[in-house]
């Protein structure tokens, strides 16, 4: 069941990317709608990766450790921890209170890479759009 939910989450993340990429190539890139779409993309990435971490944690896979110990607590505690780690990773803050291990390292690298690349892509696209309008 967790695999099916994970696949659905991956498809949703891909569809979010597809929608934003499509919006990037419209005539007026820097608009209110585009900013809202970028915000939704970041939120969907944050929640999507958070759910992937949570699925792994709930499946007794050790993907995150806190102070050298696996994540413990109830479902809500694990959910909050997974979303927090996803946000800290996506926005490249990295406080150091949580650390990925095993598969979590691979997931964290993918999420951090996306977090680094997205602002550069949007900035470059905005500059190109401004130059083309002049």
Regions found by a protein language model. Give the residues of each.
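Alpha-helical transmembrane spans of integral membrane proteins, capturing the lipid-embedded, hydrophobic core
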Residues: 7, 11, 38-47, 113, ...
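Alpha-helical transmembrane segments and their helix-start/interface "positive-inside/aromatic belt" motifs
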Residues: 27-43
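Alpha-helical transmembrane segments of polytopic integral membrane proteins
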Residues: 13-18, 45-49, 53, 119-124
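Outer-pore turret/helix-boundary of cation channels
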Residues: 40, 44-82
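Alpha-helical transmembrane segments of integral membrane proteins, especially early/N-terminal helices
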Residues: 1-11, 75-80
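N-terminal signal-anchor/start-transfer transmembrane helix
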Residues: 5-23
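Pore domain of cation channels
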Residues: 81, 85-134
């Amino acid at each position: 069941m967790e695999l099916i939910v994970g696949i659905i989450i991956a498809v949703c993340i891909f569809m979010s990317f597809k929608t934003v990429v499509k919006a990037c190539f419209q005539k007026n890139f820097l608009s209110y709608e585009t900013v809202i779409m970028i915000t939704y993309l970041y939120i969907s990435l944050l929640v999507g990766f958070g759910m992937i971490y949570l699925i792994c944690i709930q499946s007794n896979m050790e993907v995150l450790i806190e102070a050298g110990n696996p994540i413990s607590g109830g479902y809500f505690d694990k959910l909050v921890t997974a979303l927090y780690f996803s946000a800290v990773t996506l926005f490249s803050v990295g406080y150091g209170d949580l650390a990925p291990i095993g598969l979590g390292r691979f997931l964290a690298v993918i999420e951090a890479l996306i977090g680094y690349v997205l602002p550069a892509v949007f900035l470059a696209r905005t500059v190109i759009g401004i130059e083309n309008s002049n």
